[in-house]
């Protein structure tokens, strides 16, 4: 019939135009950069989700595995030992001193560093060598969940990472609810003996202490891991002393405090120990450490004079 053919041709042209535009859009999307801001505000660009990742701290390696990105890791630093698969990764030095040549040789498309643990001068050198560097700095318990989500985005494993982040937040909320109304316990958290070191206010462990209804007696200090004196501890007079050492074994030096009989923590035998791996690594396992910390502070409360 007259007029039908032009309409059909017009329809076909529209279909072809739509198909061409769609193909162009998809092609552009496929080559679009992924843009992120790291914890220092630095812009990080990736052409596609990272496939060759180097973690410059044990907790970063552990969190990458938790985020489903373990198979995308090509290197890490000394003491990266969890999960067991992390022990098999090539080493690129220690987190405080990395081997730039070893990193470059592994041809990573992403290096994830720790602001307060790694040397930021070396991080800048990695950027100068043309490598993409993402700086991480979790300071609060909630940051662990956010970190999992971000690692999932960086590695293209959000399906796993988002589930782990949700589980973390659920456990965190349960701990918060269980400890919200408990009386405060003045707490000294001892990282090491010589030099005598603790955690300052910005440190994630201070957040864990608050979560458990504790009050970090050195929480007013702005450093992450300040050195302090025995006299400062005596003056602060904590009700509980929580120490870490190496692994599960209670450090022998914890009972060095017994000589200071005036300390409330000593008088009530509130000298506790937690494995540093589950307390001082910014990973999902920090909730295991926090659970133990909360239990220790409950013991301290139970030993108060009636």
Residue ranges and their predicted role:
Residues 10-19:
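Bacterial N-terminal signal peptides that target proteins for export
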Residues 27-31:
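N-terminal signal peptide c-region/cleavage motif recognized by signal peptidases
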Residues 33-36, 42-43, 109-110, 114, ...:
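Extracytoplasmic substrate-binding proteins
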Residues 39-41, 92-101, 117, 221-230:
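Short helix-initiation/N-cap motifs at beta->coil->alpha
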Residues 51-106, 110-116, 217:
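A short, structured surface patch at a secondary-structure boundary
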Residues 57, 115-116, 191, 221, ...:
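Short secondary-structure boundary segments
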Residues 77, 202-225, 245, 272-273:
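His/Asp/Glu-enriched short active-site or ligand-binding loop at hydrolase and phosphoryl-transfer sites
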Residues 100-107, 129, 228-237:
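Short helices/loops that flank or line small-molecule/ion binding pockets
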């Amino acid at each position: 019939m007259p007029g039908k053919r032009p309409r059909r041709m017009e329809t076909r042209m529209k279909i072809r135009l739509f198909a061409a535009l769609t193909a162009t859009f998809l092609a552009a999307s496929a080559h679009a950069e992924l843009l992120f801001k790291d914890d220092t505000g630095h812009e990080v660009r990736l052409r596609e989700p990272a496939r060759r990742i180097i973690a410059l701290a044990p907790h970063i390696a552990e969190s990458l595995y938790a985020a489903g990105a373990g198979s995308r890791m090509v290197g890490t630093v000394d003491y990266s030992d969890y999960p067991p698969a992390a022990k098999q990764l090539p080493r690129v030095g220690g987190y405080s001193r990395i081997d730039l040549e070893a990193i470059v040789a592994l041809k990573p498309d992403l290096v994830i560093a720790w602001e307060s643990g790694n040397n930021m001068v070396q991080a800048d050198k990695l950027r100068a060598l043309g490598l993409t560097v993402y700086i991480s700095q979790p300071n609060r318990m909630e940051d662990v969940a956010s970190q999992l989500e971000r690692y999932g985005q960086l590695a293209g494993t959000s399906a796993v990472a988002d589930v782990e982040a949700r589980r973390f937040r659920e456990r965190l909320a349960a701990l918060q609810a269980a400890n919200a109304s408990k009386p405060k316990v003045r707490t000294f958290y001892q990282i090491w003996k010589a030099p005598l070191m603790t955690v300052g206010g910005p440190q994630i462990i201070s957040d864990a202490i608050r979560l458990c209804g504790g009050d970090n007696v050195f929480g007013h200090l702005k450093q992450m891991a300040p050195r302090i004196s025995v006299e400062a501890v005596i003056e602060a007079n904590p009700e509980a002393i929580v120490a870490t050492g190496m692994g599960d074994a209670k450090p022998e030096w914890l009972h060095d405090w017994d000589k200071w009989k005036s300390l409330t923590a000593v008088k009530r035998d509130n000298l506790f120990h937690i494995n540093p791996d589950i307390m001082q690594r910014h990973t999902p396992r920090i909730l295991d450490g926090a659970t133990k910390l909360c239990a220790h502070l409950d013991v301290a409360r139970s030993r108060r004079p009636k």
